[in-house]
Structures are given as structure tokens and as C-alpha cells.
């Protein structure tokens, strides 16, 4: 599927890249709102490759239980290299990256950070591994800057390392943040973007005083109604499907502006033809999920009070968005963790993760 819209967010990111690095940027939003698709579009189609080199670290599909797993995710080992001095290797890697895009073009979104095997093995022989890791990345990025290339470091689903500690006490996440602040705000060596669908994690970051002045946020929300209807036209043309204005209004009334759901509905429409049936099926699936969750709560799931959950959900019968203070902290955290509600920490508001969830709440209650 061709990329659609998001020009506002794309232009914001491109303007950030034109300036000297000064912040860690958190790209966040509801589930399936298009965060990864957005950064993919920027990196693959909008980026001036003569100026930038993207590095992409994907925590989404990795089981990261300790610092060793983190390092394995961070680096790609050059098994053929016998170079023991990381500075020598970093210089040669920087030369390779600057001379041509052949090495980069192998990677769809951005390359991992390559290290020579002797250096990688030496890291794992030490108790405190983070110092060597950070020193190598800093040196590599400094060399790229010297050659006129600005690195872009992207972390997908960074919250996956939230609980990992260094040597049993200090959190890896805060060690990493200190390093990233040094790379951006202090040394201006690289741009950093962190993607996350976990709004509790974003709230956690947002509330940390030590990060203020060193981080900023980009919200990738579901489409507004006008954009959602245009997206339906865009897809209908691609899929050679005739959608009436009534059809589009009906789709929006069920799934709102969530691009993934709109896409799923229109793709199914090619085979099923019955739009109302498709939408009702999706809604019933969501309602069943909510009903199952409430049944577990009624049986004392995680010590959550059933009546308090019901009262919280009832607040959304006539409201799509509410101040987070309207719902007790314990209850809202539970509903956010269960992907029923989405928290916007910048506005201090809560809303259902999607129109589909909102409709399921209203239908159940």
C-alpha cells in the first residue's frame, strides 16, 4: 500500500533533522496509529542520504531479559573482522558508510551498528559492559560527523528494556538516556528518535524531572474524520471498490480514523461485499474481548475492583476523551495496560484506544 498523508508529522521530523541535534524525540500514539509506518516513510523516501545515515534498533520482536540481550540487539557482529582496536574498526566503518550506500541499502529501514567480533567478545568478558558500548558508538558517530554525515539513531519499542538493571542496581534505561542526552544535547553528534505504543511508558518519561529540557514528543494519533474519509477514497481507488458517502460515514462511525482498521475493512470488502456485516463482526470481536476482561476482573483479576472498572468505563458512554484525573490511578493504569484506554501525558487526557473500543464500551454498558 502506498503511503498516505502524515505530511504534518513528516515535515516536523524533517525540520528537526535540519537543525543541530538537541533532544531525544519520543514518537508515540495509540496502537496501530502508524508510528512505524511514518518513520519508515521518512527514512526510506524522504531522507537526504547524502547528509544522514540511519541506524535502526528494533526491540519489538526480541526477548530482552538482561544487558547481554540488549547488547546483542544493539549490535550486528562482523564475524569476518579480526580488528581488535574498536577505533580502527570505527574509522574503516565510517569510511565505508560515507563512500557509498551499498552497505546501507541492504537494510530496509536503517542499519544496525556493526562491531568487530574481537571487540564484541571483549565486551562480554567484562562485568560493566555499558562503558565500552557507549564509547564505541560515540567514537563511530564522531567519525561520521567529521566526514559530513549526521547519524540518526532510532529505537523501536524502547520500553522493552525498562526493567533491566546494570550490575543488579542501576537501571539500564537511565544509563542509556544519560548517554543519549550526551549525544544530542551536549555533543550534538546524532539525532535520536524513540518509538513507543506504551503510553504509560511515555507518561513515565514525561514525569522525569532529570529529562526535562532534553526530550520532546511527537504524537501520531488516529486520523481526524476529514482525513479518514480521504483515506477511504484513496484505498477504494487502489482496490477498485466503489464506496458511497454513506458507506464511508458508516465505516467511520465504527472504526473512526484508525488507518489499520480502515484498511482491513476495505480489503475484506473485496471478498465479503457486505459492509455492515464486516463492521458488526469487528465490533463484536472487540466487545467479546472487553466482556472477557470484565469477567476476569469480576473474578478478582489482579486485585482490581469490578465496580470501579465499570464506573470508569461508564464515563465514556457520552465522552470520547476525559481528563485522566476523572479515573482513579490504579484503575486507569489497569485499563491502559489492557489496551482499553490511551493516555496522552502531554494533555493529561484519556480516551479509548480506538473508536472500535469506544463503540464496544457503549454497546456493553
From Swiss-Prot:
Keywords: ATP-binding, Nucleotide-binding, Plasmid. InterPro entries: ATPase_dom, MJ1010-like_2nd, P-loop_NTPase, WH-like_DNA-bd_sf. SUPFAM superfamilies: P-loop containing nucleoside triphosphate hydrolases. ATP binds at residues 29-36. GO terms for molecular function: ATP binding. It comes from the Archaea. Signal peptide: none annotated. PANTHER family: ATPASE DOMAIN-CONTAINING PROTEIN (PTHR34301:SF8), DNA-BINDING PROTEIN-RELATED (PTHR34301). Belongs to the archaeal ATPase family. This is Uncharacterized ATP-binding protein MJECL15. It comes from Methanocaldococcus jannaschii (strain ATCC 43067 / DSM 2661 / JAL-1 / JCM 10045 / NBRC 100440) (Methanococcus jannaschii).
